[in-house]
Amino acid sequence: MRAYFMDDIPGDQRLPHDSGREISDDVLRSIGVLHWHIPIDGAGAYKDEVLKVAKEREYKNHDVIVINKESLGDEFESKIKNFYHEHMHEDEEIRYILEGSGYFDVREHATESWIRCHMSAGDLLVLPAGIYHRFSLDMTNRVQTMRLFKDEPKWIAHNRGKETDANPFRTQYVKSIEVQ
């Protein structure tokens, strides 16, 4: 995974929008974002490593989704736009990329800047509950992702706004990163 500050140039969300300013693992950790690279091997040993992380974080369920034009059909454009709306979740968001690639953009709270995390096969990302973020495919227009969940699979997005800013999960997140 490669992380960097996004440029502020308008344009296709699937383009890199690379400002040239790299982000260190320490900066990502300071905002609660964790990542690992677990190479995908033909024997399937990567599954054990991913499930080990899931167990450590008390995740019990997972599913696999494919995001591309073929799998989403007529809903492709609307789904992609929906994923790109700035939002947060009340649970951690854990994603492991099996095939393809895409971007998770996370807000750096102190500056309101976007940090773009370009993920590809073998990358595992954990976003803390309460962090504002969004997702976009890159120019490959396809990704296959394992989603991990504490309980039953669910994906409830709370789009950014005054009400969401006051959400207890959001306020707890902000407090947790201000302590550091």
Model regions: which residues?
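Eukaryotic short linear interaction motifs
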Residues: 103-105, 126, 133-135, 154-156
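A short beta-loop-beta micro-motif enriched in histidine and acidic residues
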Residues: 80-94, 112-113, 119-121
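Double-stranded beta-helix
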Residues: 136-180
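N-terminal leader/capping segments at the start of a protein or of a new domain
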Residues: 1-65
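Mature, function-bearing regions of proteins
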Residues: 17-18, 30, 116, 175-180
